[in-house]
Amino acid sequence: MAYKLKQSGDYRKRRNFSMIKNSLELDNLLQIQKESYQWFAQEGIKEVFDELGHIESFSGNLTLELGDYEFDTPRYSIKECKDRQITYASPLKVQTRLFNNETGEVKEQEIFLGDMPLMTESGTFIINGAERVIVSQLVRSPSVYYSKELDKNGKPVFASKVIPTRGTWLEYETDAKDVIYVRIDRTRKVPMTTLLRAFGLSSDEDILNMFDNDKFLKNTIEKDSTKNTDEALIEIYEKLRPGEPTTLDSSKNQLITRFFDNFRYDLAKVGRYKFNRRLNITDRLLNMTLAQDIVVDGETVFTDGTKITKEVLEELKKYLEAGYGKEEVKINEELDTHNVVQVLYVYSPLDPKKKVKIMGNDQDIDVRTLTISDVYASVSYYLNLLEGIGHDDEIDHLGNRRIRQVGELLQNQLKIGISRMERVVRER
């Protein structure tokens, strides 16, 4: 029988007896592992140092920076490591700079940070003389997810989860009395309006103006015991840390640490991409009917009542991407500075005479922490779902999953190690 010789990897050739040509080339799985580790060694470590390698003392007098790094030659070969039952690794040396912020003095020194295990040509690691492999993980992508269930009366009930790569989760839910609650890091729930007050919408009027007098938020306000931003901050602190003494400063610092601190909260690049894609107002516009004129440079390009088909949406995207509908909104600037959202009005599918406000986040944001713009947009999407606008997610769909390869897994472990080192350095 006729066959063709086909290269498989760097060293082997395989006989292929297939009569039909494969439409897809098989990936070199070994090369994927090796390229991922190479990315970690060349770029992943640098990203961690750029993100976390700026350590300041509690007094603010001294600042330590982690700069360039290099790998020294491994002490032993792969065979020697197996024979001696030790780890095949290379010393990682880092150039550090210590700044004295009072005198302006700068000291530079190369330090030994640790032994970094090296990947062999086979895509494995030698750990204590034994050959080991890091298995890629299939995980849920960081994003904003919305789910729908039917209660015992057949009424749709929505829930939402705001999930980062690392950090505190937010979960939205609605009870039988149409009151919206939020759970912060899966703890006891608080009314949604309490969180909105903490993020800058201090009064009832601020909340209702922002979300267009939404009836669900009106119900929630009635259950909310707080009346302004300061009370909301303290209420959230007491829910998350019951029994601890409460001050306004500690309440603010807690929210900053949980959501707006690079050390504690990280969306990663994929998370920011998914957040911006999900919270973009274009995700909710298809098959809706415009409830406003779209006027650009004094010219009406779309009129009130226009049905948003695929063709209309593609044209509308051009104006939205150019900044149409962007507004600055009220936020708690002590927590965050991102105060831009994008707004458009459509008619409700459930009540064709009712105008509904669609609010998206700032698509120009490229930070890896949560922003108040993200929170407002995620709440708006949740309220839109209750009006029949938008769509829920199938959480187990592979489109909502991603693969964490060896390079990213190692980078995450390095982040944990640098964060621990940062605490020790500050204390000393």
What name fits each language-model region?
Residues 1-428:
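N-terminal non-catalytic structural scaffold regions of very large proteins
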